[in-house]
From Swiss-Prot:
InterPro entries referenced in this protein's UniProt entry, alphabetically: Atg12 (IPR007242), Ubiquitin-like_domsf (IPR029071)
Organism superkingdom: Eukaryota
Gene: Atg12
Family: Belongs to the ATG12 family.
Main location (coarse class): cytoplasm
Protein name as it appears in the record: Ubiquitin-like protein ATG12
PANTHER family hit by this protein: AUTOPHAGY PROTEIN 12, UBIQUITIN-LIKE PROTEIN ATG12
Organism: Rattus norvegicus
Gene Ontology CC terms, in alphabetical order: Atg12-Atg5-Atg16 complex; autophagosome; autophagosome membrane; membrane; phagophore assembly site membrane; protein-containing complex; transferase complex
Keyword field: Acetylation, Autophagy, Cytoplasm, Immunity, Innate immunity, Isopeptide bond, Membrane, Ubl conjugation pathway
Signal peptide: none
Residue ranges, annotated region (Disordered): 24-54
Length: 141
């Protein structure tokens, strides 16, 4: 199956905003152009000098009997919280209100719902992306 390179998904913004007022834009990897290889990069970092990357790449992997998302790599704003990701995944997978969803970083721990994705990326990101596992039942610590 071919995926639509222009696919963009939207979900409600930060929890403080009223429902429907603003939308979070998540786009698959194919909708984000890669920077040219001629861009100067500081030693030890993956970001151009003097410019902070506004979105980070997140790789979402299903665990257990949880449905698999066809698009696994997403670009998300650094300021988004883990709870916003949980809400997005629940909506994307069309989970019932009674079904739980757990998020794990690197198959080891569940981050706090108010934790910002950018902070997780800085601490646990590797190869230019943050790997998050999602499941409907508790899997790790």
């Amino acid at each position: 199956m071919a995926e639509d390179p222009e696919a963009v998904l939207q979900l409600p913004a930060a929890p403080a905003a009223a429902a429907g007022e603003s939308l979070l834009e998540l786009s698959p990897e194919t909708a984000i152009p890669e920077p040219p290889s001629s861009v100067a990069v500081s030693p030890g970092t993956e970001e151009p000098p003097g410019d902070t990357k506004k979105k980070i790449d997140i790789l979402l992997k299903a665990v257990g009997d949880t449905p698999i998302m066809k698009t696994k790599k997403w670009a998300v704003e650094r300021t988004r919280t883990v709870q916003a990701l949980i809400d997005f995944i629940r909506k994307f997978l069309r989970l019932l209100a009674s079904e739980q969803l757990f998020i794990y970083v690197n198959q080891s721990f569940a981050p706090s719902p108010d934790q910002e994705v950018g902070t997780l990326y800085e601490c646990f990101g590797s190869d230019g992306k943050l790997v998050l596992h999602y499941c409907k039942s508790q899997a790790w610590g």
